[in-house]
Amino acid sequence: MAYLKVSGTKIVDKDGNEVILRGAGLGGWMNMENFITGYPGCEFQIRAALADVVGQEKSEFFFDKFLEYFFTDADAAFFKSLGLNCIRLPFNYRHFEDDMNPRVLKPEGFKHLDRVIDICAKHGIYTVLDLHTAPGGQNTDWHSDAGTHIAKFWEHKDFQDRVIWLWEELAQHYRDNTWIAGYNPLNEPTDPYQTRLIAWYDRVYAAIRKHDPHHALFLDGNTFASDFSHFGDAEKRWENTAYAIHDYSVFGFPAAPEPYVSSEAQRRRLRRSYEKKREWMDARGLCVWNGEFGPVYARREYEGDLTDSINEERYRVLKDQLEIYNKDRLSWSIWLYKDIGFQGMVHVSRDTPYMTLFRDFLAKKHRLAIDAWGADDSAVRHVYQPLIDLIKQEVKPEHQELYPAPVWKLSDRVGRLARNILVSEFLVREWAEHFRGKSTEELDAIAKSFAFENCLHRDGLNKVLTDNASLVAQGA
């Protein structure tokens, strides 16, 4: 078997035949996220808190079993049965390097990544390696696992150097694996000055190519993979490279401006948002990969009788997005495969030990809107509105927009700092205390809640994906 490669606007096999990658991201696994697995704040915070409550040995046991159960042969078989052929694998740099011991490789970091890559290969599924978290945080969000809203990765050359080092290690380790479709060196960068990202891409491209001339690279645009406007003629320096957009639609979230009825105007808005992200690539005849997209879904414990109607609306959004992608023969990776019930193709049953243990805590999280992703802040909006009003009153209008505006509005920034960082921080210990006194056997059972056999399927979502995967396969 030969490597996939980028040729013009397409991904092709060794014979030059087009390969359209259709799949999902394995978010919440080797890069945990609060809304995916139900904790507050950032992964580094809960790992430290759990070690403090149950001890380092039991904490490491729990997280290792979590990684083991989260994706197994059964998951890969199910994924393949849907007609999908690629999984994006987000991972945290901390699996391979410690902040207090930089540039010293942790070989155990490869344990689960190798395992899942091999399982996927066995089932004929390609993988894309996605560095989702970098030292200092490469973006302003929780999923860069930095605990702040400032992307310090761009402020410190040493942080950048460490990731160059890490990709050299990864390239040497994986250079001969042809089931890896390519490397996604940095997820959703947010460089306020734009130019530092391009300079870093030049460096990581050279570092990877020094060890691995074969694998394709998938480079995210700036500002959450939405903006290539400052890339200039950089493509002339990067061979075998595709460019990654993340095409989330506001219609797929609780803050949608209006109900989505698939009107001509709404479909036109979907198309225009997507086309704007890929303008730079289209002007140059370059390959585009949609590395993330997808709605979130209502849950009966929160939305009650409105759940089904809300979700049918979200499926309409997804269908219309995929229709656009199919016409362009676009490779895509929906976000995401597995979670606790908000966005995943499969989700942990509410009857499992994990969901039973955290039922009341998850309800509190939802009420306080401490996760940023798809938050419904209606129950606490009155608490934060005075702060928003104060800023609007006291800060000149021309100074109210701070990067990454307009992606973040003023109210979003207040929510990120006050709810998603500050209040979340106070709930980290409460999350960890749920594990106090648990035996090794109980910790294993809690972790096993995430195993495929303990998950439910979001059939409406999976049918949409399967239908569209088959359309692409037929050349529709």
From Swiss-Prot:
Molecular-function GO terms, alphabetical: beta-glucosidase activity; xylan 1,4-beta-xylosidase activity
Catalytic activity: Hydrolysis of (1->4)-beta-D-xylans, to remove successive D-xylose residues from the non-reducing termini
EC number of the protein: 3.2.1.37
GO biological process entries: glucan catabolic process
Keyword match Protein biosynthesis: no
GO-annotated cellular components: cell surface; extracellular region
Sugar-modified residues: N468
Locations listed in the record: Secreted
Family to which this protein belongs: Belongs to the glycosyl hydrolase 5 (cellulase A) family.
Function: Catalyzes the hydrolysis of xylo-oligomers to xylose units and plays an important role in xylan degradation. Can also perform the transglycosylation of xylose and alcohol. Has no endoglucanase activity.
Name under which the protein is recorded: Beta-xylosidase
